[in-house]
Amino acid sequence: MKVKVQTLDAKASGDIELNDEVFAVEPRADILARVVQWQLHNRRAPARAARERSDVARTGKKFGRQKGGGTARHGDRRAPVFIGGGKAHGPRARVFESSLNKKVRALGLKMALSSKAKDGKLVVVDTLELKDAKTKALIAKIGKLGFGATALVIDGEAVDNGFQLASSNIHTINVLPAIGANVYDILKHETLVLTRAAVEKLEARFNG
């Protein structure tokens, strides 16, 4: 698959040949859903347990007499009705992490990249280097390139520092190095922007 490459000034900068095994895989909703769910499960922090009645370190002695005291028929001070007592039906400790086969994860990433290419939402730029690392200047360039409502920009080994600084105040743009490319973030944004270096890194990731 051949795609046109642009500069940040929206000028033509030649073409790039994309590997069909990475950027032309037929997307499957079930695979993409499994990978996204796996990502979100692993992002979730473990649930902490609350101390229930049996977990509270308080006396087990009966609170007052059963009859004749003029009060409720309480058992011990660990009951949920007392301050310092246990929690009634409290949350238990739970870890939400799940596992997913490496091949399925790799296939999901290929499908996410391919879905953007198929929908015409893939933009390839030559480099992210900015002469003037200012937010105002970057917004003007983005308008010419047509990034859409939201864009995920992926660079090579590391994101260009000037571009990262200039884009940090633009809430519709997120940037990642190639190693951080993932299905959830790609699908979450309307447009996927790759540099030449990012394309090389992503293709090497699957071929290596």
Swiss-Prot record:
Cysteine disulfide partners in this protein: none
UniProt keyword annotation of Transmembrane helix present: no
Top-rank taxon: Bacteria
Region of interest called Disordered, as start-end residue ranges on this chain: 47-84
GO molecular function: rRNA binding; structural constituent of ribosome
Pfam family, one: Ribosomal_L4
GO CC term (a single one): ribonucleoprotein complex
GO biological process, one term: translation
Keyword Ribonucleoprotein: yes
The entry's keywords: Ribonucleoprotein, Ribosomal protein, RNA-binding, rRNA-binding
Skewed-composition ranges (Basic and acidic residues): 49-58
Function: One of the primary rRNA binding proteins, this protein initially binds near the 5'-end of the 23S rRNA. It is important during the early stages of 50S assembly. It makes multiple contacts with different domains of the 23S rRNA in the assembled 50S subunit and ribosome.
Subunit structure: Part of the 50S ribosomal subunit.
Homology family: Belongs to the universal ribosomal protein uL4 family.
Stated name of the protein: Large ribosomal subunit protein uL4
The species this protein was found in: Rhizorhabdus wittichii (strain DSM 6014 / CCUG 31198 / JCM 15750 / NBRC 105917 / EY 4224 / RW1) (Sphingomonas wittichii)
